[in-house]
From Swiss-Prot:
It holds the Pfam family DHDPS. It comes from Nostoc punctiforme (strain ATCC 29133 / PCC 73102). This is 4-hydroxy-tetrahydrodipicolinate synthase. NCBIfam families: dapA. Homotetramer; dimer of dimers. InterPro entries: Aldolase_TIM, DapA, DapA-like, Schiff_base-form_aldolases_AS.
Length: 294
């Protein structure tokens, strides 16, 4: 259950000039990504600006993207919430649409203890037993770290199939890998950590950079899997400046700027996010030119 491949793109949400969701551009971008290294599209997560999307907008995005990439890529729906009841309702509705899985973020702001976090994910899994769930641990945004021991207990649930691990900690990822069966997939939640996490048994990455270099990320992962460590390392080091540039300010501000520099009409970010300032824009443009991406 729930093989999502190696490169999962945390896809941006395009907006029109009036701030409404541009479903047409979303569908076009999804096809482009599916044709350029992306195995699975992760919709309406952090990079997709889920905090400023309504549930109705999210469901419509799921529908449009599912139709556009049918047979080319899988779709994971971001349905997480800091309300267990709300997360269950959203996940059940997304499941009926036909998504291939759901991303479930650690509940934010209310900071449940580990027992509460475990019960939260257990409840969602039990309410949607046929839908693969991917845990999402990003304590820098949620204020709470999902401990490896908690992850290990959740990994025993048949439809909790993996984790997007975004602590940036080799220690944490190593302990998760040590405590969970190899069938439980660890995905790096940070592009710069992908190669290091592959070394301790990760499956791949939920990537922002794959909007721009999806094929190269596939090549890096496949090279590592084939034992061509130097090739994988060289790709990692070549792309490392891009990995850092895409987080010069709050994600997804830089990646949207990069896509616009490539000619994609993805619009701005919704407030309270804002446009990239001149310094960020110039640094990002320099990296993109250095890598011949614009």
């Amino acid at each position: 259950m729930g093989d999502f491949g190696n490169v999962l793109t945390a896809m941006i949400t395009p907006f029109k000039a009036d701030g409404s969701v541009d479903y047409g551009v979303a569908a076009e971008l999804a096809v482009h990504l599916a044709n350029n290294g992306t195995d699975t599209l992760v919709m309406c997560g952090t990079t997709g600006e889920s905090p400023t999307l309504s549930w109705d907008e999210e469901y419509q995005l799921f529908v449009e993207v599912l139709q556009s990439v049918a047979g080319k890529a899988k779709v994971i729906a971001g349905c997480g919430s800091n309300s267990t009841k709300e997360a269950i309702a959203a996940t059940q509705k997304a499941s009926k649409i036909g998504v291939h899985g759901s991303l479930q973020v650690v509940p934010y702001y209310n900071k449940p203890p580990q027992a509460g976090l475990e019960a939260h994910f257990q409840a969602i899994a039990q309410a949607c037993p046929d839908l693969p769930l991917l845990l999402y641990n990003v304590p820098g945004r949620t204020g709470q770290n999902l401990q490896p021991e908690t992850v290990a207990r959740l990994a025993e649930v048949s439809n909790i199939v993996g984790i997007k691990e975004s602590t940036g900690s080799i220690d944490q990822a190593s302990e998760i890998r040590r405590l969970t069966p190899k069938e439980f997939h660890i995905y790096s939640g940070d592009d710069y950590m992908t190669l290091p996490l592959l070394a301790i048994g990760a499956k791949g990455v939920v990537s922002v950079a794959s909007h721009l270099v999806g094929n190269q990320l596939q090549q890096m992962i496949q090279a590592f899997s084939a034992g061509k460590i130097e090739v994988a390392r060289d790709i990692h080091l070549q792309l490392f400046p891009l990995f850092k540039a895409l987080f010069l300010t709050s994600n997804p501000i830089p990646v949207k700027k990069a896509l616009k520099l490539q000619g994609w009409e993805v619009g701005s970010t919704r407030p309270p996010l804002c446009e990239a300032d001149l310094e960020v824009s110039q640094k990002l443009e320099g990296v993109l030119k250095e890598l011949s991406l614009i």
